[in-house]
């Protein structure tokens, strides 16, 4: 039988991001050509949020306004953290007080071809994972 606490590392205890957590949405984004970590991150966030609707959220937010919603984005990126445009990622989220946390993760794999006309520097595909947490 698996020892889940050891497998999951148990590193995230006592998280104080929000008092009330409503949603955690998961997404994946890739940049197939061009090795652009920001493009992959934006696609991951879009993938996480574009399959959801939260029509009752205003009714539980303080003062009934989306301005009081807190949104935390966790991005697992494989490389080029210094090239990640966090402000561009934040613009994908239309409402709330947005924070972004970047951690090591994601994936690099080969596309099998280098396409200079697509700004390829090599044959790597950049894959980013995103967790978008919504609460107040």
Would you name each region that the model predicts?
Residues 62, 66, 112-115:
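Metallocofactor- and cofactor-centric catalytic cores in central/energy metabolism, strongly enriched
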Residues 66-68, 127:
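Short connector loops at helix/strand junctions that flank enzyme active sites
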Residues 15, 62-64, 91, 121-123:
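Sterically constrained small-residue positions within well-ordered secondary structures
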Residues 70-114:
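Mid-chain, well-packed structural core segment of small domains
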């Amino acid at each position: 039988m698996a020892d889940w606490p050891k497998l999951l590392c148990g590193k995230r205890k006592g998280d104080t991001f929000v008092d009330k957590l409503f949603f955690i949405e998961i997404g994946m984004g890739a940049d197939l050509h061009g090795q652009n970590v920001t493009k992959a991150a934006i696609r991951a966030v879009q993938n996480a949020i574009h399959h959801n609707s939260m029509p009752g959220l205003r009714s539980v937010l303080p003062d009934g306004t989306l301005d009081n919603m807190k949104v935390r984005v966790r991005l697992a990126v494989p490389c080029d953290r210094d090239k990640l445009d966090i402000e561009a990622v934040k613009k994908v989220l239309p409402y709330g007080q947005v924070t972004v946390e970047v951690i090591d993760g994601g994936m690099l794999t080969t596309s099998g071809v280098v396409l200079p006309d697509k700004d390829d520097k090599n044959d790597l595909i950049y894959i980013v994972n995103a967790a978008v947490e919504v609460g107040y």
